[in-house]
Amino acid sequence: MDVFKQSEVWFVIGSQNLYGPKTLQQVMDNAHQVVNSLNSEAGLPVKLVLKPLVTTPDEITALCREANYDTACIGIMTWLHTFSPAKMWIGGLSILNKPLLQFHTQFNAQIPWETMDMDFMNLNQTAHGGREFGFIGARMRQQHSVITGHWQDKEAHQRIGQWMRVAAAKQESQQLKVARFGDNMREVAVTEGDKVAAQIQFGYSVNAYGIGDLVAVVDAVSKGDIDTLVEEYEATYRFSDAVKLNGDKRENLLDAARIELGMKRFLEQGGFKAFTTNFENLYGLKQLPGLAVQRLMQQGYGFGGEGDWKTAALLRILKVMGTGLKGGTSFMEDYTYNFQPGNDLVVGSHMLEVCPSIAKEEKPLLDVQHLGIGGKADPARLIFSTPAGPALNASLIDMGNRFRLLVNVVDTVEQPHPLPKLPVARAIWQAQPSLATAAEAWIIAGGAHHTVFSQAVGVDELRLYAEMHGIEFLLIDNDTTLPAFKNEIRWNEVYYQLNR
């Protein structure tokens, strides 16, 4: 999934004409060096494109308007090398609808104590030029990101890369289409929500399709395409005896391959990058899509079970953010607990649909086993465990007057004992700060039972994503205490009521 290749971030230098052509030329020469260095040495996921120097209100407004309509541009990164009077930026910032990052840096890392004169001081004015720019953003009540540090600093590089990933995710959100196969699981509350409000807030559209629409595409899949896909399965996974050639569940595997091919074809034809299924809406399908969903998630699609479109969209967004990073991202559900003093654990899984991008095993086991839910034939699925390491669970919920993004930091652990009778993929983790506090805080905040589990994307990216969209962000980690967490929820309630 190469979502960054066609994207770019515009690097914009603001100044004013009173400095004269010589100084302004030096500013642009320095900017060229900074951009070239960042593109070649900083490991950024998205290319920086240096734009012409802007020194007047008309130039700034024209540039912001151009950025809005350029589909390759996912955001603007500004550097106030000199002083740029911020009233000049009001017109441009008032129409800008792309993410904005203020890089508060300067060309020189250290002060040249013995040679510094007023010419040097006039050229290198980031320290107060950046403050002028910051004021107008605050005065206009426009949230923009600020990163401070020298342009050769590794930490600054990392933070710029994070911002780029989130900017790309916002761009993806604006064009994302989510397909719901069937409707919501009956009587379930948290998977419901205001899809119109979500499209206004995030940009993505959510539409439902009768299961018959999918079945028609599935039934049209050819035997040759199925055979080719099964060959891919055989090269990629370990097979149980039941699904090997002449195995008693071989036909179930072929049916699963047909469903995968049909489902992917449907999504591709409609331009969908996320989807949901529901085991209560399976008429015409021979089995609940398990293997198909797992493999589509690994290819970058978002997914939510039981019609959970918010989790499906969020999963796609995190897939975009985490492109190229170590670790995977999956649909997940807190399934059962291990209450043991000093070793409280959570087993996360789902009926079938856990993404192999988080698999510890190089070749997961492909098997067909009974599923007591859905009333269909035994479904195919990949079975694996998850490697130890830091991770998080994220949930997007509709609070009526706002959307809330809830995140719990967790520590994934090695599976402590074999699970010979559990025929599904799973992850096992210790919740921060403890199982008791994390679970109570999650429940108090109304967090969903479905989550996006990620070992690739971190808290900083999700907090920034919430800021870019103007939604509530709540974090449960080692610093969380329940009294403070409850107070934060109360304060947020007041803020979002006043800020409607």
UniProtKB/Swiss-Prot annotation:
Kindly list any coiled-coil regions of this protein. none
Cellular component aspect of the GO annotation: cytosol
Keywords in alphabetical order: Arabinose catabolism, Carbohydrate metabolism, Isomerase, Manganese, Metal-binding
Q: What is its EC number?
A: 5.3.1.4
Pathway listed for it is: Carbohydrate degradation; L-arabinose degradation via L-ribulose; D-xylulose 5-phosphate from L-arabinose (bacterial route): step 1/3
Catalyses which reaction(s): beta-L-arabinopyranose = L-ribulose
**Pfam families for this protein:** AraA_central, AraA_N, Arabinose_Iso_C
UniProt enzyme class: isomerase
The GO terms this record gives for MF are: L-arabinose isomerase activity; manganese ion binding
What's an example Gene Ontology biological process for this entry? L-arabinose catabolic process to xylulose 5-phosphate
Alphabetized SUPFAM superfamilies for the sequence: FucI/AraA C-terminal domain-like, FucI/AraA N-terminal and middle domains
Q: Where is the signal peptide?
A: none
- Name the needed cofactors: Mn(2+)
| InterPro entries linked to this entry | Ara_Isoase_C, AraA_central, AraA_N, AraA_N_sf, Fuc/Ara_isomerase_C, Fucose_isomerase_N/cen_sf, Lara_isomerase
Give residues annotated as binding Mn(2+).
306, 333, 350, 450
How is the cofactor bound, in the record's words?
Answer: Binds 1 Mn(2+) ion per subunit.
Per UniProt, subunit arrangement is: Homohexamer.
Described function: Catalyzes the conversion of L-arabinose to L-ribulose.
Q: Which family does it belong to?
A: Belongs to the arabinose isomerase family.
This protein is called what? L-arabinose isomerase
This protein's species is: Yersinia pseudotuberculosis serotype O:1b (strain IP 31758)
Q: Lineage of the source organism?
A: Bacteria, Pseudomonadati, Pseudomonadota, Gammaproteobacteria, Enterobacterales
